[in-house]
Amino acid sequence: MADFWVWLQGALKEPTASIDTDKKHSYNAFALLTIFSATSFLFTVYHAKQGYYGRMASIDAHFMEQFPSLNLFSVFSILVATSLFFFSILMGGFVVKRFVDQDSDWTLEKALQAHSRLLAIPVLLTGIASFFALFNGLRFAVLLCLISIGLTLLANLYIISRPSKDSQIDSFYRLLLAFLVNGGVLFLFFLAEMALVFDYLRILAFM
């Protein structure tokens, strides 16, 4: 744990530095980011349902029947959807590097290391957000999660916008193609994510 904390501090200071580190730190960063994000989402949904929608249910007894119950399947769905979101960011950058830039050296291992350093700030933010979500500080938790998502997408943009040294495509067309390919990957994953959590997002619509 101490080694990971040292790695995280280094990633926060220099997120774009090309440093070969123990791959377990990259896996730990993605695991923590997924767990913190899923926890924030789950507790935000729980408190929103118990608070605002609980009051509405006191007026209309059938109101709560319109929304899904929170159970073990809910936890699993939210965790899988969150994992898919961050994996889509990783895969988007990987596909662009391998098939647009034709960079055979860009492996999933390398993509994981590059992305994990860029996602150090979201790891920290979602960790704080999960704490606030646990204790019903929903608006601050949602704000931190939205900032985290924005930074995650910015990290994805940073990765795909940097051409490989051996890229033979004109820089403008290369960037256009990278956006299209990356967008296609993210969209396919987005459909799967929405299939898993759309009903829970409805609970947050009027929070």
Regions found by a protein language model. Give the residues of each.
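Perimembrane loop-to-helix junctions flanking transmembrane segments
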Residues: 15, 52-70
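Membrane-interface helix-boundary motifs at transmembrane edges
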Residues: 21-25, 101-109, 163-173
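Membrane-helix interface motif
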Residues: 43-59, 192-202
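N-terminal juxtamembrane cytosolic/stromal segments of multi-pass membrane proteins
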Residues: 1-37
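Alpha-helical transmembrane segments of multipass membrane proteins
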Residues: 36-41, 85-89, 121, 125, ...
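Alpha-helical transmembrane segments with an aromatic anchor "belt"
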Residues: 65-131
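Transmembrane helix-loop junctions in multi-pass membrane proteins
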Residues: 46-53, 103-105, 127-137
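Terminal transmembrane helical module of multi-pass membrane proteins
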Residues: 130-207
